A protein has these predicted regions:
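PLP-dependent amino-acid enzyme catalytic core
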Residues: 1-305
């Protein structure tokens, strides 16, 4: 028996539809207790602040978020007894707002993108004496994935070699943490990032459309270890949403926009590895990440067509 819901962190690795002669496998992170991959860094950042003496009973937490980190922090705050205030850009799905409030968090909506939310969180930190965990630069964010998600992948693949990790980038914590752990075991593993085609700053473009929810913040996060990255793939939001619908209707996997984008890129990498012969086992094994459930995107129209 777990002592509380936070001990339930963890997710399955599931083989999904893959190009012929390849294996694409996804970490289905909606199986975490708060429903996304961001539950892991939310817990790690809070516990790191507690251990450092920066967060004590009675303190309030403030954090800018596009949704999932905020939900994770709201859940952790509910368990540990912290008041949580979340600052979110307008235009993000109504489901995310409702889930945060359901956990008891206060929510402030700002005009603009995640940069505007960061500015407002800075103001609240200074004005109200709240503790900001700063997910974009907090080392506990990638460490959460290095110490939990990465080892889970290694256990779940068994004796197979991971040939590539393909994952979308927001804070960069997921790609950095899992990537560092996998590369320790598989030095030749390919690590590829995925970003929106309309907001492709990793590809050298100017910040653009913030339509993707949870991927492509419009700047390079300090938590993203760019030296790990072998290649960056861009995906159009319409293609990502079409893949979300396919995954739901053909494979029973209800996932969000960044997951659809990552899956498209992962299948492309798997096919390329098969064609080039650059893989270790009988066929290429490509791991990707499904961050959250498509339930958080219903009002966004992702599944309407």
């Amino acid at each position: 028996m777990d002592d509380d819901v936070l001990e339930g962190l963890g997710s399955p690795l599931v083989r999904v539809d893959s190009p012929p002669g390849t294996t694409v496998a996804a970490k289905v992170e909606s199986r975490n207790p708060g429903g996304s991959a961001k539950d892991r860094p939310a817990l790690y950042m809070v516990e790191a602040a507690e251990e450092a003496g920066d967060l004590e009973p009675g303190d309030g937490i403030v954090e800018p978020t596009s949704g999932n980190t905020g939900i994770g922090l709201a859940m952790v705050g509910a368990v540990k007894g912290y008041d949580v205030t979340l600052v979110m850009p307008d235009g993000k799905s109504i489901e995310r707002r409702r889930i945060m409030r359901a956990y008891g968090a206060d929510l402030e909506i700002v005009d603009g993108d995640i940069s505007a939310a960061k500015e407002r969180a800075d103001e609240l930190e200074a004005e109200a004496g709240m503790v900001q965990l700063r997910q974009f630069e907090n080392p506990a964010n990638p460490r959460a994935h290095y110490e939990t998600t990465g080892p889970e992948v290694l256990e779940q693949v068994g004796d197979r070699t991971v040939d590539a990790l393909v994952a979308g980038v927001g804070t960069g914590g997921t790609l950095t943490g899992i990537g560092r752990r996998l590369r320790e075991v598989f030095p030749d593993v390919r690590i590829d990032a995925v970003e929106p085609s309309d907001n492709a700053v990793l590809s050298g473009c100017e910040p653009g459309n913030d339509a993707f929810q949870g991927m492509g913040p419009g700047f390079v996060s300090p938590n993203l270890d760019v030296d790990l990255i072998d290649e960056v793939h861009t995906v159009d939001i319409d293609d990502a949403e079409a893949e979300c619908r396919r995954l739901a209707r053909e494979e029973g996997l209800l996932v969000g926009q960044s997951s659809g984008a990552s899956n498209l890129a992962a299948k492309g990498v798997a096919a390329a590895l098969r064609e080039s012969g650059e893989y270790a086992g009988e066929e290429p094994l490509v791991v990707t990440v499904y961050w959250d459930s498509g339930e958080r995107y219903l009002s966004a129209g992702t599944f309407d067509e």
